[in-house]
Amino acid sequence: MIKILKSIIKRKITDFYETKLGTFYFKQKGYCPCCEEETFFIAKNSWLRDYFKCLVCGSLPRERALMLTIKNEYTNWSNLKIHESSPGERGHSKLLKEKARFYIQTHFYRDKALGTVINGFRNENLESQTFQDETFDLVITADVMEHIYNPAEAFREIHRTLKPGGAHILSVPLVNKHRSTQKWATMNPDGSPNFLYEPDWHGNPIDKQGSPVTFHWGYDIKDFISTCTGDECEIFFIDDLYYGIRAEYIEIIVARKTKDNA
């Protein structure tokens, strides 16, 4: 009887939000892979990719999908040497910082010396890194590779810094899906973007102006990475409401550096 009443109340609340207030409302009970807590996932906007948040930690679906993939593919992740480029302050980045013993965070400050520490972050350009060969077990990039001007060089550099058996695990919005990847912007001599199509910007944790979108990737990113590095690539699509993972552009890519292509 109690369950029936709860179901009725939940339905009435949802109807109220959607019909009376004209507001989308979605709530799901589950477990968050990022804060590792039983929680509710709530969205008040139909664009779940940016609005379906964990009530405890505020993580988003792509962050939960990334962390769940790390846990599923590398169960010993907390003892691995991990490099994350351009981390955020929530979601998988927060958990890795708290529990991964050998975790380093980097940002790219264009006007500062590479390899130096700035505001607690090591300054690294993904296209030209100062790390030694075969340094890391995992390299993590979350919605970063759509902002790189020379992704081929960045993928090669990430491959170089990975140990044999290591992997680059990344989220990137595959907006072109089955269509071919498009270069969206080139870099002007002064470092500003030269957009080839409509200007497109995303948020940047260290720059209020944001980051220009330089590529609209499709599923052919898998072949692009393999061609650049020889890595074995898989694209994972997770749709699991228990973990609060449901949204558009939710794919996670795992590019593994095998001993044969070291």
What would you call each of these model-derived segments?
Residues 59-74:
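Short metal-binding segments enriched for Cys and/or His
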Residues 25-31, 47-51, 78:
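Short metal-coordination and nucleic-acid-contact micro-motifs, chiefly zinc-binding Cys/His arrays
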Residues 77-191, 219-222, 253-257:
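Conserved SAM-binding loop
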Residues 1-29:
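Membrane-proximal basic amphipathic "stem/tether" segments
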Residues 32-35, 54-57:
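Short cysteine-rich clusters marking metal-coordination/redox-active sites
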Residues 41-46, 64-67:
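Short Cys/His-rich "knuckle" micro-motifs
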Residues 18-27, 149-262:
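S-adenosyl-L-methionine-dependent methyltransferase catalytic module, highlighting the catalytic core
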Residues 38-39, 61, 89:
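Cys/His-rich microdomains that often coordinate metals
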